């Protein structure tokens, strides 16, 4: 009938049996020869042929794992339901089953169908569940390569290994330092100071300079700094026409992509010049500023320091240029002093993440 299996011992005696009840659930019994009774098995896993069965506290089979197929089924009202994008306990460990219903074989972070973020080993076993609300992520064939998670007042940024690469206290004060027109020979000096104080900044680069300073851009990206788009040749975009605008943006995006494997998600128009045509054509948020240091004009480190430190407020976007030695010199004071004042130095995108976000075509001077 296909509704009963028996296990026979060495002497031909039946030592266990598994049979399907009237409600469609398998039940497992073992014969106790001491008391000469069949004992229903409860809260136990049993391997039968190429499957593992779990019998709950009532003795009903509620889970079946197919060993060779690496698939798991929940049993409800006698029906087998394939587990997809979810975690299930198999014996003593928890395992993750992907979108195809198979136990995964690639280590990494996964997002379950119910929105839980987990990290699993190469055998599919769950190492840990990562707390918080997943707000944004990138993935490759179901494995997350990065993600942003809100956990209480904290914003965490995870890498592909499930490790926190950045954490920001959303309840704390923060500002975004931005540097335009580079990279240059002075950009590395600024990165040195940022690294020393565990801080980041946003570098709005010119596409025509990217290949010459590829190592600097890679280093900035690896530090967690943001690479923004500042057009290819510092072209004033207002009045340039859609095709010219898009060429300036796309060529820069391609240059950056070639170096770090990802494109900028924000841009700054040269001189801040923009109109509706520019906003529509660039296809990214436009980032202006709330503090203009005019470092390009003064070429004076003290003036640049004062422009920042005497006017800074929570949520500011600060404009500087990494083309000048005086700006690098000023940064050696500005960065530690802002940290001492209690500011978190974040990228533009991080600032936006913590203060309501930004959209393509939107224009932003600060995030309060």
Where are these regions (language model features)?
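Extracellular adhesion/carbohydrate-binding repeat motifs centered on closely spaced tryptophans
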Residues: 1-171
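Active-site beta->alpha N-cap acidic-glycine motif
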Residues: 163-240, 244-251, 255-258, 262-263, ...
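Residue-level preference for the first positions of well-ordered beta-strands
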Residues: 175, 315-317
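Active-site-proximal beta-strand/loop segments in catalytic clefts of secreted hydrolases
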Residues: 179-181, 204-208, 231-232, 268-272, ...
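C-terminal domain-boundary segment and adjacent tail
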Residues: 196-197, 210-211, 326-368
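Residue-level detector of anion-binding/catalytic polar loops
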Residues: 200, 226, 285, 292, ...
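Alpha-helical scaffold elements lining the catalytic groove of polysaccharide deacetylases
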Residues: 219, 235-262, 271-314, 327-333
């Amino acid at each position: 009938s296909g509704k009963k299996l028996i296990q026979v011992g060495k002497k031909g005696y039946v030592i266990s049996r598994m049979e399907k009840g009237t409600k469609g659930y398998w039940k497992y019994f073992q014969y106790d020869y001491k008391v000469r009774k069949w004992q229903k098995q409860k809260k136990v896993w049993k391997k039968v042929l190429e499957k593992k069965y779990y019998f709950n506290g009532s003795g009903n089979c509620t889970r079946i794992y197919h060993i060779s197929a690496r698939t798991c089924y929940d049993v409800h009202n006698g029906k087998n339901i394939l587990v997809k994008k979810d975690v299930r306990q198999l014996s003593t460990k928890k395992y993750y089953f992907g979108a195809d219903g198979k136990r995964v074989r690639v280590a990494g972070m996964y997002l379950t169908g119910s929105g839980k973020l987990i990290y699993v080993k190469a055998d599919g076993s769950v190492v840990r569940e990562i707390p918080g609300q997943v707000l944004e992520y990138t993935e490759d064939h179901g494995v997350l390569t990065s993600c942003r998670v809100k956990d209480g007042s904290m914003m965490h940024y995870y890498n592909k290994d499930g490790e926190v690469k950045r954490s920001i206290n959303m309840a704390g004060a923060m500002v975004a330092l931005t540097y335009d027109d580079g990279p240059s020979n002075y950009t590395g000096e600024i990165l040195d100071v940022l690294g020393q104080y565990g801080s980041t900044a946003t570098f709005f680069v010119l596409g025509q300079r990217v290949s010459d300073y590829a190592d600097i851009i890679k280093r900035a990206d690896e530090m967690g700094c943001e690479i923004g788009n500042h057009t290819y040749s510092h072209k004033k975009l207002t009045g340039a026409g859609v095709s010219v605008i898009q060429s300036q943006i796309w060529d820069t995006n391609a240059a950056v992509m070639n170096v770090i494997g990802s494109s900028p998600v924000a841009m700054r128009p040269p001189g801040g010049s923009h109109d509706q045509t520019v906003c529509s054509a660039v296809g990214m948020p436009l980032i202006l500023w709330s503090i203009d240091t005019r470092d390009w004009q003064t070429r004076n480190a003290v003036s640049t320091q004062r422009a920042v430190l005497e006017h800074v407020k929570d949520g500011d976007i600060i404009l500087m240029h990494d083309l000048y030695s005086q700006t690098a010199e000023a940064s050696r004071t500005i960065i530690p002093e802002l940290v001492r004042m209690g500011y978190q130095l974040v990228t533009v995108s991080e600032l936006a993440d913590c203060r309501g976000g930004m959209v393509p075509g939107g224009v932003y001077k600060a995030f309060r």
